[in-house]
């Protein structure tokens, strides 16, 4: 199935409310491999409640279900994720209520 470029480029979401908790923050860290070595104290602050910190890359997936791409008509089993950009201006809070704005900036159909 061909990609409908105009449809995908017109998709966007504005001010979608989403919440995440400290539990989500720790689960993300565990999911990407932090905490495998119980003796590695550098990773402890990402998987344990005391002095908890958020991994910056969590911003790329934090509100995945709140986006607009469900209506894109794309078969995601056939998609290769080529690249993504992330600008970090300050550390993510360990838990928050956020507003999500998202849009597609480029599409390449190979």
How should each PLM-predicted stretch be described?
Residues 1-83:
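Hot-dog-fold acyl-thioester-processing enzymes
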